[in-house]
Amino acid sequence: MSGLLPVAVYALKVPAGGLLIPAVPDAAATFRVSMAAIDPDETPEFEDGQTRPRATLKLIRPPADMDIDESDDDYEEDSEEDSDDEEINGGPSDKEKARKLKEAAALKELEDEDEDDDSEGDDENFDLKAAISKLVKGKAPATDDDEDDESDEGLELDEMVVCTLDPERHCQQPLDITVAEGERVFFKVTGTHTVYLTGNYVIPAEEGPSEYDEDEDDEDDEDDYDLSPDEDELVDMGDLLDDEEEDELDGLAHPRVTEIESDEEEAPKLVESKGKNKRTADSDEEMALDDMMAKDGKAKGADNGEPAPSKKQQKKLKKNNGEAAAVEQKKEAKVAKEGKEGKEGKEAKEAKKVQFAKNLEQGPTPSGQKPGETTTGTLGVKEVKGVKIDDKKLGKGPAAKAGNTVAMRYIGKLEDGKVFDANKKGKPFTFKLGKGEVIKGWDIGIAGMAVGGERRITIPPHLAYGKKALPGIPANSKLIFDVKLLEIK
């Protein structure tokens, strides 16, 4: 039933006694019956010889080979032939009104027959098939009585049992019956109780409101995309990206990174410091880069605080007084001093390594990281089911999986860098992973993240909005999201 949308409640009361009740007057709409129920407190209406209270619901319809459209054509031809007489008598007739009158007359005959207890064996004054034929055909042209009798004698109705309900053990029954618009269907109940049918009137999904329209009408819904961000949301990337967008490597298709080994490289720390500002693996790498830059700046400074001369300045000195040689000697002395300091620092770090080994032999060292907060996943670029995933920072704890409710911060961009959507402050965006509440690229790209993790996901058009154009998003657009996972519920 994924192609139909419910739009209104359908309800029908089918009384006991075998009376035929039209499913929908005039067969004017498509509907779906989802429940049949009886009232266990209702007083049973026992028929002759019946001792057990129960009700059987039946569905009745005309045979599939009955051509109702043919009767419509006959009506049109008949109306054309009599058009002159109708104009003399006061104008063209109302076909809808005539059909309703015929149906009402047929139903009245059914009710009169049901109320007459003495006429069960008498078929001379009432023809059940003829009455049903009038209801089913509805708009059939008026013919002679002999022609009606001949057509009604061949009418055989399809009668099917839907369910049997018992007020003591089985008061209701879930159903899944869809009746199309224009389809003539009747219900009747035999037994002791009235049956109540409920469901929904439905329309095709393509005629209903689009998913985007519903999101636009309810901007406060926590699962919506805010596709018209405020100006203050279009500024810098904030604490989500940490200036990673400006990285020159992002513009390269296949960047090559060369690892430089140095004597000053610290051994990997097995235990975080006990200070207030504890850092993750990524922040340690950033700190190491900052330290290298700071030491390089100190190496270029003179003892009196003056900066070392540049190559251009050295050339000028050489031309003037030949003082460049003295400068070179001074620079070599500084390098020797720094080499000595570097050697001492290396020995101190080797001592640290030994100290860590001793601690490991003595037992686990207390740490600020809890046992369950191990990092999840690996850094780098990978492709999963067509979605490009670039982990910038690994989170801690269990990985998000289908069925989890996740809280996210994100910034959405097009390939040209234009931001079309963002959630960087206030209430985070939450949704249930893997349940189709977001575009397919998000269900694929968010899976596997841990709390605190940051990644960039590049989603191809067929996993985003495809050929559908949205405000700020052209059709067939590749979308790039920088996301951060805040919480897993």
Curated annotation (Swiss-Prot):
Task: State the activity regulation.
Answer: Inhibited by both FK506 and rapamycin.
Q: Where is this region: Disordered?
A: 40-157, 199-378
Q: What is its main location?
A: nucleus
Pfam families, alphabetically?
FKBP_C, NPL
Q: Is Cytoplasm found in the keyword set?
A: no
InterPro entries reported for this sequence: NPL (IPR041232), PPIase_dom_sf (IPR046357), PPIase_FKBP_dom (IPR001179), PPIase_Fpr3/Fpr4-like (IPR023566)
GO CC term, one of those recorded = chromatin
A single GO molecular function term of this UniProt record: peptidyl-prolyl cis-trans isomerase activity
EC numbers, comma separated: 5.2.1.8
Compartments (UniProt record): Nucleus
**What domain of life is recorded for the organism?**
Eukaryota
Q: What class of enzyme is it?
A: isomerase
Q: Does the keyword Nucleus apply?
A: yes
Catalysis: reaction(s): [protein]-peptidylproline (omega=180) = [protein]-peptidylproline (omega=0)
| Chain intervals with Acidic residues compositional bias | 66-88, 110-125, 143-157, 208-250
- The residues covered by the PPIase FKBP-type domain are 406-489
Skewed-composition ranges (Polar residues):
362-378
Keywords, ordered alphabetically? Chaperone, Isomerase, Nucleus, Rotamase
Indicate the family of this protein: Belongs to the FKBP-type PPIase family. FKBP3/4 subfamily.
Q: Which PANTHER family match?
A: 39 KDA FK506-BINDING NUCLEAR PROTEIN (PTHR43811:SF19), FKBP-TYPE PEPTIDYL-PROLYL CIS-TRANS ISOMERASE FKPA (PTHR43811)
Question: Assembly and partners?
Answer: Binds to histones H3 and H4.
- Functional description taken from the UniProt entry: PPIase that acts as a histone chaperone. Histone proline isomerase that increases the rate of cis-trans isomerization at prolines on the histone H3 N-terminal tail. Proline isomerization influences H3 methylation thereby regulating gene expression.
Protein name listed in UniProt:
FK506-binding protein 4
Q: Which organism is it from?
A: Aspergillus fumigatus (strain ATCC MYA-4609 / CBS 101355 / FGSC A1100 / Af293)
Coding gene?
A: fpr4
